[in-house]
Amino acid sequence: MSAFDTTAPSDTVTAAAGSKRGRGRIWRRLLRNPLTVFGLLWIALLLVCFVAPWLLANHDPVRQDVSLTRLRELPSGEHWLGTDAYGRDLYSRVVWGGRLAIKAILIALGLATAIGIPVGLLSGWRGGRIDRAIMWVVDVLFSLPLILLALAIVGALGTGLVPAMIAVGVLLSTRFARLTRGVALAEREELYVDAARISGLSTAAILRRYILPNVWPVLIVQISIISGVILLVGAVLSFLGVGSPPDSYDWGAMLNQGREQVLAFPYQVVPSAAAIVLTVLAFNLVGDGVRDAIGHSSAAAPRRRGERAERARRAEPAPTGEHAEDALLSVRGLTVEFPGGDRGPARVVDGVGFAVRRGE
């Protein structure tokens, strides 16, 4: 154990147990919200479509049946969502399209977080000229229309799902950079960060141990909401013909195919449009549920700590007469606070007691 490591093993075990209890409380709050449960179940269904779509699909999504009885068919026992103008099963195409939707979200979201989080940490932690230069670039990109910039980048990289999602991921990284920077700016002024600096921890260790754990709860909410944005932007790009190929089972491409049949068979756009709407709604419902659950836990944490400290002070035995006679200095229930601005006073010492006897 280093000279600066003052955490007792029992404290570590207690902190770990408290962390597990906190996660359990968050999950219980999530599962008590029926809208959040619906969002989680829908996303779980999409993950099944991503991993093994053949388990859910009952037809080949690209097989055409040009017999007159199979063209533009409404939902039936054999074709649950009907068929399109080429006799392809719409239900199977929606299921396999879910695989492309999750793939698009993973590509764009992975790139956005890989760029945005480190850039935001660097900007918020260093400050000064580096912060101003980074945020100038971020603000410029943030102010421009996302679809137009994505079209420009796709024009340079080429059409296709992967180039389109690379463009979307680069542009959406500004959202994560701004969010991470805001948390880093607030956390770097905390007393425990100053203590970590004094103890000799490196910048990387401080960011990993103290800053990132406070960033993740906010990022989880943002990730859920941004996932819906990625799906919408990807569908628009595929609808315009610069994402997935026009004849693919991508949901945006299916909308474009239905647009061509909107007069002869308007129902064709319904399955893919419903899949997009429900998926975006599910991600937003999960994001709202996580935000409410985490916010409730964060608000309750200081109150629980205060209650525990108050119980500890009440349970602390009063100094005996022997201690009072022998001690040159006796202190009980010492509390030290500093003004904390809008957040209230910052308590750095709480309920400390000690005695100094002759010769000590």
Regions of interest found by a model, annotated:
Residues 336, 353-356:
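Conserved A-loop
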